[in-house]
C-alpha cells in the first residue's frame, strides 16, 4: 500500500488543505453509487476511472523520462541538446527561458490562503493536463514531417499525445461524478514555443523540443502525484 507523506515537499500545504476538505468530499461521494454489480462482482466505476487515470499518468511519466533521455543521447538530437544545455549554463536569455519556463504553469493547481475547494482543484488539473494537448499534437505533426527522425522518438511522442488525451477524458469524467453540477471553462494555456517548433529553422525546432522535454518531464510527475492524492481522498483507496 502506498503511503502519502504529508510532509513531502513541495506539496505539503496542498495536502493539509486536502485533508481539511475530506469531510466535504465524503459527503459528495455518498451520492455516487458505491459500485455496480457485474457478473457477480462489485465494480466501482469511479475507482476504476481513477485506476485508469493513474495508469495513464504513470505511462506519461515513463515516456516523458525516456524521451528526455533520448533527446540527449540519440544522434538525431544529441548535439543540438548538448549545445542548448551549454547555453543554458551560460545563461543565454532565450535558452534560459526555454529551459526553465513552462507554459503549463499558468494552469497549475495552487492553493490560495486557507481556501481550498476540491472541485476547483480538479478543474485546474483538467486545464493543466489540457495545456499539453496542442504542444504534443503539433510535435507529432512536425516530427512526422522532419527528415531523419528515429522511429523510437516518434513512437514515444505519439504515445505521449494519445495517453495525455485519454487522461484528460478520464479527469473530465471524474469531475462529473464528484461534482455533478460543476461547470468548467476549459482554458488551456497557449504554448509560446509553437512558432519555434513550426519554424523552418532547425535550431528553433530543437529549442522548442528542449523546452517541451524539460517541462513535460516535471509536469507528468506533478499530475501523477496529485491523482494519487485525489484517489485516496475521494475513494478512500490506496492511501
Swiss-Prot record:
Coiled coil: none annotated. It comes from Rattus norvegicus. The keyword Transit peptide does not apply. It is found in: Secreted. Disulfide bonds join 35-42, 102-215, 232-239. One of its GO terms (biological process) is positive regulation of receptor signaling pathway via JAK-STAT. Placental basal zone cells. PANTHER family: PROLACTIN-8A6-RELATED, SOMATOTROPIN,PROLACTIN. Keywords: Disulfide bond, Glycoprotein, Hormone, Secreted, Signal. Glycans are attached at residues 211, 218. The keyword Magnesium does not apply. This is Prolactin-8A4. Residues 1-31 form the signal peptide.
